[in-house]
């Protein structure tokens, strides 16, 4: 019965604190992204950001082409046999 009385306190503690303190890396990232070196933002993040950008653009172009293909197919009437 005693363990049930401590449950609300345990639950609130579990959600309000972290076991591992994380270092605030926002100032470091701001320094990288605010640096005036002539690079676009999608390249300043490194290799991962460049790959993610290229993948996103590829999927966008392929998806647009696929949509236009099906719009063209839908716009052409079928011939009666």
Curated annotation (Swiss-Prot):
GO annotations of cellular component type: mitochondrial inner membrane; respiratory chain complex; respiratory chain complex IV
Membrane topology (UniProt): Single-pass membrane protein
Annotated TM spans: 51-72
Alphabetical GO biological process terms: mitochondrial electron transport, cytochrome c to oxygen; mitochondrial respirasome assembly; regulation of oxidative phosphorylation
Pathway(s) it belongs to: Energy metabolism; oxidative phosphorylation
Gene deletion effect: Reduced body weight due to diminished lateral muscle mass, leading to reduced swimming capacity. Mitochondria show reduced formation of mitochondrial respiratory supercomplexes with CIV dimers, leading to metabolic alterations and non-pathological muscle performance decline.
Record-level Gene Ontology MF annotations: oxidoreductase activity
Hydrolase as UniProt keyword: no
Keyword Transmembrane attributed: yes
Location(s) in or outside the cell: Mitochondrion inner membrane
Presequence range in chain numbering: 1-21
UniProt keywords, alphabetically: Membrane, Mitochondrion, Mitochondrion inner membrane, Oxidoreductase, Transit peptide, Transmembrane, Transmembrane helix
UniProt similarity note: Belongs to the cytochrome c oxidase VIIa family.
Function: Component of the mitochondrial respiratory complex IV (CIV, also named cytochrome c oxidase complex), the last enzyme in the mitochondrial electron transport chain which drives oxidative phosphorylation. The CIV complex is the component of the respiratory chain that catalyzes the reduction of oxygen to water. Acts as an assembly factor that specifically drives the homodimerization of CIV complexes, mediating the formation of mitochondrial respiratory supercomplexes (respirasomes) containing two CIV: supercomplxes with two molecules of CIV show improved activity.
Subunit structure: Component of the complex IV (CIV, cytochrome c oxidase). The complex exists as a monomer or a dimer and forms supercomplexes (SCs) in the inner mitochondrial membrane with NADH-ubiquinone oxidoreductase (complex I, CI) and ubiquinol-cytochrome c oxidoreductase (cytochrome b-c1 complex, complex III, CIII), resulting in different assemblies (supercomplex SCI(1)III(2)IV(1) and megacomplex MCI(2)III(2)IV(2)).
Annotated protein name in UniProt: Cytochrome c oxidase subunit 7A1, mitochondrial
Phylogenetic classification of the source organism: Eukaryota, Metazoa, Chordata, Craniata, Vertebrata
Gene name as annotated: cox7a1
């Amino acid at each position: 019965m005693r363990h049930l009385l401590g449950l609300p306190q345990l639950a609130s503690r579990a959600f309000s604190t972290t076991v591992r303190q994380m270092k605030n890396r926002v100032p470091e990232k701001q320094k990288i992204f605010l640096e005036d070196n002539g690079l676009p933002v999608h390249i300043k993040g490194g290799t991962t950001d460049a790959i993610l950008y290229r993948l996103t653009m590829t999927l966008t172009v392929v998806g647009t082409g696929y949509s236009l293909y099906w719009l063209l197919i839908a716009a052409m009437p079928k011939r009666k046999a």
